[in-house]
Amino acid sequence: MDGFSRRCLTTILTMLCLEVLPSALMAAEPDRDVLADRVAKLSRGTQWKPISAVPINFLTHHPQGMVKIGDTLFVSSVEIQQPTKRFPQPVDGYDRDTGAGVGHLFKIDMKGNLIADITLGEGTIYHPGGIDYDGKYIWVPVAEYRPNSRSIIYRVDPETMKAEEMFRFADHVGGVVHNTEDKSLHGVSWGSRRFYRWSLDASGKPTNASEAPEKLRALNTSHYLDYQDCKYVGKSRMLCSGVTEMRVTPDAAPFRLGGLDLVSLADGRPLFQTPVLLWAASGMDMTHNPVWMEASDAGIRGYFMPEDDKSTLYIYETEVK
């Protein structure tokens, strides 16, 4: 092949790649729209079929959030070295001390083996929360282990596991989602009682992170679930999983009911809510900690990791179109 032919072939291949790559990047967007539409068809009567239960082959501590990229899981977790202690009376606006610990982001294969582990946070900021993947980065909030505190928001390259601090914020941010359509980041506070929105510039840094939290927050009008893990699902919506705990008396053992909320990011109101009537043998509700949902051939496949330390990845599927 002469030089001219090689140059022509190179040009053609380059043009084909430029056409294919955007299509590949956009392929996930219809999937998340399909997922959101199918979630809205779930109900209390939905039957979830167990697919597998995969033991996680290392100490997971207290898992918080999960994303699945291909056949790899990424799970945020807090290693509690010294539990927090409540004050008899609030001290400087806090109801407890900081405790001590280490924040982790684990990279795990589908057989439950640890591929990589990075630590996130600094000092008293060691509690990672719910996480989201935007097609390029995993967004991870790390906060003090108490309400009304402080947070550092990171984004992590899933290939290299390199973390980049994006900003700091004067409240406990317990979960984030990245709205890739209007270039904004959304956060939920301790117990998901408050919502935050940060506009992002071209570099992914917020343009309003220095604003007082009181100016940015909106109150969550739904009190059914405390959100643990949220994901962006297109059209300015997030899919949040979480739990509510109920006690017959203050000293009684809690009954834990898990569920899913499809929430509008425009006003923070739930568009759809449903319980998820699944529990592990330990009694822990499946949506208590990390959750990943995806559209499947049958309908929806859910990945759950509700238990601490010696965790199991529970995979369920339900038929819904």
What do these predicted ranges mean?
Residues G70-D71, G135-K136, E181-K183, K235-R237, ...:
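Short coil/turn segments that connect the beta-strands within blades of beta-propeller domains
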